[in-house]
Amino acid sequence: MKEKIQKNILIKNKRATFDYEILDVYTAGIVLVGTEIKSLRLGKGGLVDTYCYFHRGELWVKNMYIAEYFYGTYNNHVARRDRKLLLNRKELRKLEEASKSMGTTIVPLKLFINERGLAKLQIGLARGKKQYDKRASIKERDDRREMDRALKR
């Protein structure tokens, strides 16, 4: 019997929800080499300044950081290489059409290990926020926090 995975590793892109309005969310598999998955299980990764793009009908994630595995030998991976994402053909076509429209992009939202031990990347079709939208988001968050404080008293 297989041993259960102890904890669900989760790496979030905190800037994505602040900088973008998320229109649609997908969960994609990600092609990794051995030392990359070992490093991710230790929680050594980052999604800062990461984005997705299409190349020859395939979806790739660019600038995703996965730290080199500490116990890796000369076979260790490159920390910021482009990695292929795995989605259904129907989802790929839908995303490609949507990303070609003006003002939309595909951004990674979070990276996690599922119950089967596979690395998954949650991506979102997003539209950039204007500066005043960001200010409104901050004000709304502060107002919600103050209301919660008042209710606790």
From Swiss-Prot:
It is found in: Cytoplasm. It holds the Pfam family SmpB. Keywords: Cytoplasm, RNA-binding. GO terms for biological process: trans-translation. One of its GO terms (molecular function) is RNA binding. Gene3D superfamilies: 2.40.280.10. GO terms for cellular component: cytosol. It comes from the Bacteria. Belongs to the SmpB family. Required for rescue of stalled ribosomes mediated by trans-translation. Binds to transfer-messenger RNA (tmRNA), required for stable association of tmRNA with ribosomes. tmRNA and SmpB together mimic tRNA shape, replacing the anticodon stem-loop with SmpB. tmRNA is encoded by the ssrA gene; the 2 termini fold to resemble tRNA(Ala) and it encodes a 'tag peptide', a short internal open reading frame. During trans-translation Ala-aminoacylated tmRNA acts like a tRNA, entering the A-site of stalled ribosomes, displacing the stalled mRNA. NCBIfam families: PRK05422.1, smpB. This is SsrA-binding protein. It comes from Porphyromonas gingivalis (strain ATCC BAA-308 / W83). The gene is smpB.
